[in-house]
Amino acid sequence: MIQIPSDLNPGLVPLAFLLGTWEGAGVFDFPGEEKCNFGQEVVFSHDGRDFLEYTSHTWVLDSEGKKVRPLESESGYWRIDKDRKVEVVMVRDQGVVEVWYGELADQKPQIDLSLIHI
């Protein structure tokens, strides 16, 4: 069950399912880059204003799943309007700024986003 904090801005209730700390692991495999295992931690938080704060950190993992070194980090803000349109503005540690727009699906926790600006 999703818990909605009492101090969450009412306009952000549709995004409440994102709040908290999320962790996972995968394989980093991009052309021109060294393939490696990685771990990721994503945190969505709020302070009562009309946006969610987002941070993400990834690390290279060894064969036992232990952190070897930082891989990438990014941070930004998520907003939603009354028509369920979502805007994400984030900056990556390489100095790249991304703006994503999309829509929150009806009746399920799914957001479809498209990159608009880099």
Predicted segments with their positions:
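N-terminal helix-cap/turn-to-beta initiation motif at the start of protein domains
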Residues: 7-21
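Short hydrophobic/aromatic-rich beta-strand segments that constitute the beta-sheet cores
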Residues: 24, 52-56, 86-90, 110-114
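Flexible, membrane-facing loop/turn or short amphipathic-helix motifs
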Residues: 28-34, 62-66
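Amphipathic hydrophobic-ligand
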Residues: 35-39, 70
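N-terminal glycine/threonine-rich, aromatic-flanked beta-hairpin/loop signature
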Residues: 39-61
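A short, structured loop/turn motif at beta-sheet edges
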Residues: 44-50, 79-84, 102-110
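Helix-adjacent hinge/juxtasegments
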Residues: 63-102
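Conserved small/polar residues in nucleotide/adenosyl-binding loops
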Residues: 116-118
